[in-house]
Amino acid sequence: MKIDKTKELSHDMSIVNGKKIKLFALSSNRALAEEISKAANIEISAVDVVRFADGEISVNIEDSVRGHDVFIVQSTSAPANEHLMELLVMSDALKRASAKTITVLMPY
């Protein structure tokens, strides 16, 4: 009997085919991130995005990403500048938190 390892998923839902994976949804396209999460059988990881009165954006990643391949879902829909800055701040936070790779899924 042949086992298809491409669909193998560990019990902790963050390891797919031996790779530690995290999926994050930012504010612009949560619905798409939920569809990806369901199709890939990966939970969306927790992130807290705060916008201060002066326009500054703060991102707090609530899960450890050290050594993980990270995917971020964020589009450039209006307001494009705010969504792009949110993505850049998130990418910086992930890099500083030692994510192995960062891949952005950015639909137009």
Region locations from a protein language model:
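PRPP-associated nucleotide enzymes
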Residues: 1-108
